[in-house]
């Protein structure tokens, strides 16, 4: 009889666990369906690490669809003729696999910006000074973790294309103009580790 009683107890415990777990999941789903965030602001910590102030907003369009728009601006000049002066706007349409502002998403983004960079060899162009603009598009994947009702964290990475059109100058103030060039870039176009505050 003892083994039969133990088996019955195990079955009852398992059934109770499944009942509680299922009820909890159902309540969570109901809560998420009645309250999905609609609007959030964010900032990318990785851009701040390059001394680039930045801010983004994200707006809910449907249960699994959002529009993210980020912008950054860097006016600084450093020593040894180094500078990464630029502004950039990057809108992105996101499709969420679970629900918006939660879990995995795929994105389609565009970008446009103007730059005045020197002695950095970005995009593999060399160490001269480059004054011009860029535009293009890409795809991305990201994941968002909910920390609390108002706070979240997000990691994202994207690849794509950028067309650069620029005037090339010798390094230094008043450097000689060396020509006008274009450059087609394929590679990473988006990377982020962002902190998010949900407004509503």
List PLM regions with ranges:
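Cleavable N-terminal export/targeting peptides
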Residues: 1-34, 199-200
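Feature captures outer-membrane beta-barrel proteins of Gram-negative bacteria and organelles
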Residues: 29-32, 53-68, 88-97
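Residues that define the transmembrane beta-barrel architecture of outer-membrane proteins
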Residues: 37-39, 49-53, 83-89, 102, ...
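Membrane-embedded beta-strand positions of outer-membrane beta-barrel proteins
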Residues: 41-43, 57, 69-71, 91, ...
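Transmembrane beta-strands of outer-membrane beta-barrel pores
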Residues: 45-49, 71-77, 95, 110-116, ...
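Repeated loop/turn-to-beta-strand initiation elements of outer-membrane beta-barrel proteins
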Residues: 64-67, 101, 149-153
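Flexible, solvent-exposed loop segments that connect beta-strands
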Residues: 72-86, 114-135, 164-184
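Outer-membrane beta-barrel "beta-signal"
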Residues: 95-96, 185-200
């Amino acid at each position: 009889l003892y083994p039969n009683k133990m088996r019955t107890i195990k079955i009852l415990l398992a059934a109770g666990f499944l009942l509680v777990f299922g009820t909890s999941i159902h309540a969570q789903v109901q809560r998420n369906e009645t309250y999905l965030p609609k609007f959030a602001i964010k900032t990318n910590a990785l851009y701040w690490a390059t001394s680039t102030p930045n801010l983004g907003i994200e707006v809910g369009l449907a249960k699994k669809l959002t529009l993210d728009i980020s912008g950054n601006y860097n006016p600084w000049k450093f020593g040894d003729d180094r500078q990464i002066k630029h502004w950039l706007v990057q809108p992105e349409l996101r499709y969420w696999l679970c629900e918006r502002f939660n879990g995995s998403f795929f994105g389609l983004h565009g970008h446009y910006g103007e730059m005045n960079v020197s002695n950095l060899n970005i995009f593999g162009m060399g160490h001269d000074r480059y004054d011009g603009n860029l535009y293009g598009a890409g795809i991305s994947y990201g994941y968002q973790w909910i920390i609390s009702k108002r706070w979240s964290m997000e990691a994202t990475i994207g690849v794509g294309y950028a067309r650069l059109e620029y005037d090339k100058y010798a390094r230094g103030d008043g450097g000689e103009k060396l020509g006008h060039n274009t450059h087609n870039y394929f590679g990473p176009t988006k990377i982020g580790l962002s902190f998010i505050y949900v407004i509503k």
